[in-house]
Each structure stands twice: as structure tokens, then as C-alpha cells.
Amino acid sequence: MADKVIRIKDLRPQDVRGDRYTLHRGNVLDAYPDWEAPDLIVSDGAYGVRGFRGDTVSADGLVDWYAPHVAQWSKRAKPSTSLWFWNTEVGWATVHPLLEANGWEYVQLVTWDKGLSHIAGNVNGNTIRQFPVVTEVSALYRRRLTLPTEDGGVLGVQQWLRAEWRRSGLPLCRANEACGVKNAATRKYLTADWLWYWPPGEMVERMAEYTKNNGKPTSRPYFSIDGHTEIMAEQWDSLRAVWNHVNGLTNVWSRPPLHDGERLKGTLQRSAPRVYKPSKQSAAHLNQKPLDFMDRQIHAAS
């Protein structure tokens, strides 16, 4: 995270660069060509609620709105890239199939509970026909990792590991000897069922070395990612998305909306095509996210 909050005082299309960040002031589609492969993407775009100029009027238009962005995220992502996708419940549900179709694997949904202060004075009990909404959601996705096989196809990680070991002609039980464990290799790393566990890079490197020395001769190194070079522990570990656990945090985050000095105000621009005259106290963004949420997401997944 940057050490300071950058206040946007005008609308000139001028980028702001620092040692730890580049803030592009303009259409993000113009920034993608120079975008380095991201470790983490945090998306807070269209919600389908007319929330800003360019937002859609309903969730129905969100797939078309996000399609060019999802294409760029998918094109430039690394195997270990994670994505936080902010939206309404129905907005996220609408875009979810698009993300899945582009190789993003759903992990979980985080709910921001803003509490009763978010709706205080804004609910007419005589006319409302649903529970008042005090939430937004942020879905966590990771890249669906597939790896190349000897015959030119691809397999998911779990299936690929089994296929590489079987390619050696060795019985699965000898993977335990290769890893120096009692039964963890066959019970976790090479199992075909739901008990599968991502093996540490050290164990994959050990299996690769063992199959090279004891398996059938092959011109393609066992467990090689590119089919030419032998796998190293660090290379394998780099394929896995980062997760930094914090005790006590769950997938429900309770916090009131921003009403302090962190809230961006005073642009005198209407934040959506709505009928009101903005003042110096009007929020610049109707759904501005708290910095502590941003810090939490970045720390957890990068």
C-alpha cells in the first residue's frame, strides 16, 4: 500500500507515479497495454446501479461492460494472480459466469455489512417491499491453473501431478519414498479424490529427481512446466496464489460507511446521472471503499 492518500483535485488526465505505485487518471483500457503482470487485481467498477457516469442502469448490462476488462485481466495475469471483485450481490452473480469462462476460479464471497447507519432515515416502511440493503460484496477469484502434458494437451494440477508420476512407470507407492514421508505423497499429493493437497515445491522437486533416476527414460523431464527444463522448488511454489491468514477475520466485514476525513468530497461533479446539485460536502464516489478494507485485501492475497 502507498504511504499516503492521493487527493484528486482536478480532472486533468495526468498520471501520478511514485516508488510504489502508478495512479492512472483516465480510462483503464488505455493503461492495460503497459500493465505489468499483476500479483493481485482489485476491481471496483460498474455495479448496474447508475452509480457513476458510465455505469449501467441495471445488472443486465454488466457482462458487456466488464467483458473487455476481464479479457485484459485474463491475458496479463500470472498463474498465481488473484482477483477481488467488488459489486452488489446480483451484480457479482451476473458477472460470475464471465469470470469462470475466462479461467477465473471462484474461492469465496466476502460481505461488507455497513450496519443500520447506512439506511437511517432513508427507508419508508409503508412502501418498501424487501429488506433494506446494507451490504456490498467482494468475491475472491484465482486463476484456474492447467499444465501441459506430453501429448500436447493440458490437465488441472491434481490430474497433471498423477499423470507425470504415472508417466515414469513407477508405482504410486514409491512417491512416498521419493518425498521421504510415510504416506503423505499418495494420500495427499497424488491422490485422485477430494483429499488432494497442493504439494510444496520441495516435494515436487524430489519427485522429479526420483523419477528421473528411477523411471523410464524420457526426453521430456518429469514434472517439467515447459517440457524442457527440470522443475525447481521455487518455480513450483510461484505457481500458487498467495494467501496470508489472519486469525479472527471471517468473510463478513462489519464497518459503517465512510463519514470521516478519508471520504473524498468536493469535486462538485455529480457522481451519477441523478437529479441533485453537488456541494463541497457531496461525496465524490457513492461507494468509496475504506482504506483498511483495501489494505486487508492486499495483505491477504499478495
Model-derived features with residue positions:
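Core catalytic lobe of class I
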Residues: M1-K4, K9-S302
